[in-house]
Amino acid sequence: MTVKFGYTILYVPDVRATIAFYETAFGLALRFLHESNLYAEMETGATTLAFAGEEMAEMNGLAIRPLRAGDLAQAVEIALICDDPQSSWDRAVAAGASPLSPPTAKPWGQIVGYVRDLNGSLVELCSDMTAIA
């Protein structure tokens, strides 16, 4: 049996607004948008970052706690590896991301900063750990 990590799907109140935000704030490109506007995938490399409308959770029989910018962040984050975490953090904040902590050097040598997206999801903007390991 083979298992591989394929998707992270965030259930969001507005898929199209979330796509626009991730394009502007993080420079990600849209890979796929279903005609219903309830599901989209972004170009992110080997693992797919996807957005699904909250209605999709309901359609799939899932009870979820909706993401909301004003609520305490969920205990999960999206980590985006950046060539320049500071520039990426600045771009995200200029695009409307809520700044949490600017990029700083961690004891293990990685540069890490945090923002929240328009829906309140935690987004880590970080340097690549493979350069350190």
Task: List the predicted regions and their residue ranges.
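Conserved beta-strand-loop-alpha-helix junction that forms the acyl-donor binding cleft
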Residues: 12-14, 107
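Residues at or immediately preceding the N-termini of alpha-helices
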Residues: 15, 85-86
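Vicinal oxygen chelate
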Residues: 1-7, 29-81, 87-116, 127-133
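Conserved active-site tyrosine of GNAT-family acetyltransferases
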Residues: 18-23, 92, 120
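Short glycine-/small-residue motifs
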Residues: 122-125
